[in-house]
Amino acid sequence: MRYIKEILKKNGIWVLVYIGLGIFNSFVANYKVDYFQKVIDGLADRTLAFAGVATYGFILLVNYCMNYLDNYPEKKLEHGIYLDFKLLSLRKISIIDYTEYQKIGTGKLVQRIENGSAAGRNVLFNFWLCLIRDLLPTIGFSIYFIWKIDEKVTYVLFVGYTIIFVTTNILLKFLYKIKEKILNSEELLNHYLVRGYMEMLVFRMSKQFPSEIKKTCNAKEDIVSSKVKMNMIHEAFFTIFALLVAVLDIGILFYAWKTKNLTVGSVVALIALIENAYTPIAIFNVIYVQYKLDKASYKRFEEFLGLKDDVQLRNGNAINTNVGKIAIRNLSFQYEERKIIDGLSLSIQKGEKIAFVGESGSGKSTLIRILLGLLKYNQGEVRLGDMELKEICLNNLYDRVSYLSQDAPVFDGTIKENLVFEKQVSEEQMLGVLREVQLSHLVENLAEGLNTEIGEKGTCLSGGEKQRLALARLWFEDSELVILDEATSAMDNLTEENVMKSVMQKMKNKTVIAIAHRLNSIAGFDRIILFKEGRIVGQGTFEELLHTDSYFMDLYNANVK
């Protein structure tokens, strides 16, 4: 409920306006029926005056005008609440603990957010607000006006409510099981769809698409079949209510004919008021069923929103030192049962150019993520300058660190946005930097130039172009520590050599840490650190290691082959 309360508070004024309008409109709708009784009886006994007709006309005018005005807060809240829940998910991603984020599959997460946002909107808007401003006031006013006409009919009404309650509980049991199956099938379907979209080449070349499409079709059939069943049960509610109202309508006509106690106007009013009294009950049962089902989707969404945050992003000390000087002592890191870094110690001086080299799974990337504060170490000490990493505010740290991963951190936007984000930089400066990374031809050959959209994850660019565009961003960042995690792996040897020469010239006064598998690219680094099974097993210059370290020679020879 915490997040629902948060969104209610955010939209507080419009919620109050919406509830107020709903209660007023419910009263006017029922009062209109009550007054219509007087008009009919006035016509029947020829006592109707012009004032009565004019008053009824005014009531109709108010009713229709207020219903029209009601659309504004209704749509504002309906769409706003849904998007507010989606914004909550984006805010969550911005502060979520990195290890929790790693456990989430993109396809399932997208479906969970989509379903959860819609469910949150339905719980708050379609159920609670509908109940408070529409259903309860309409039932209350209807019963009051029915009681004014004939108390006995009111008692019959309550008997009908009891029948409905029993019927509802029977149907609900079936609906819960069906909805749970739909949720699981939708997440599975989205998992297959996203996997197919993201891994097109892998599945095409391995001829896996027929199998993937078959699995997706099976999930689709389950969803369609379950939704049809659910819809039929929903419609059963309305059919039962329609039959019950029909029985009551006939009963009122029979009662009026037999007792002669009701006027024509009273009969007409009772029939209309009974429909007013029962329609909200029919609606309530349907939205209550949906509410219970939506709670299952919303619970999954809440579980995501409730995942552990990285509190260090906002908490901690402001940095008052150069983070390019690093001291690591007896560092250990364990993920679940696996020890990835074991008693590691390392010192890096300000401005030093360091390369991490080793087999896959030797701990290089894990150490990088620890230095970035993404992973929290179990034992040991990591000092940036003269400050312990655990005590630093990470948002403050990220102002001083540049990080480029192997996956080329470019995003769906323009070339300009990928270069400078929202910074104000002249076009000449940007073009100059693109020349440094051998990308000027890209802009010159495009009609939109720097404003060209590069597509999701840079799909309009080659792997090497994406990496060069990401590297160009370094020219516009005022960092003290630069970390490159195989940031040139998609480039050819000649391009990599020329681009890295420009990058290292630009970074000459900064500390640079690079992970590399292509060892010739780090030949000019001050020091190379060798990793194996979570430990440092050697270090030195490229030439020293090439002639004295058998492990490095094995890595180099394997790389050359």
Where would I find each of the regions flagged by the language model?
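Transmembrane helix-loop-helix hairpins at lipid-water interfaces of multipass membrane proteins
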Residues: 12-69, 73, 146-154, 264
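A hydrophobic transmembrane-helix motif
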Residues: 27-37, 128-172, 228-271
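Hydrophobic transmembrane alpha-helices
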Residues: 58-62, 193, 267-287
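An intracellular "coupling" helix at the cytosolic face of ABC transporter transmembrane type-1 domains
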Residues: 98-99, 115-128, 132, 136, ...
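Cytosolic ends of transmembrane helices, especially the final helix of ABC transmembrane type-1 domains
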Residues: 208, 232, 276-306
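ABC-type nucleotide-binding domain
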Residues: 321-561
